[in-house]
């Protein structure tokens, strides 16, 4: 169980991720250029809008669970 928040700021979209420990959000957020640890992670995506960021996040989540 994990949650992800995307929000526009400055010249990109920020991501904040939290996990109860079952999902390593660090791995998912690192795939998007961010960082953190297994239960908390975040970063900035240099994308034009939230729709593009959402697509990238969903792709990273899919890749995480395919491993």
Q: What are these model-predicted stretches?
A:
Residues 1-67:
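Gly/His-enriched, cation/cofactor- and phosphate-binding structural elements
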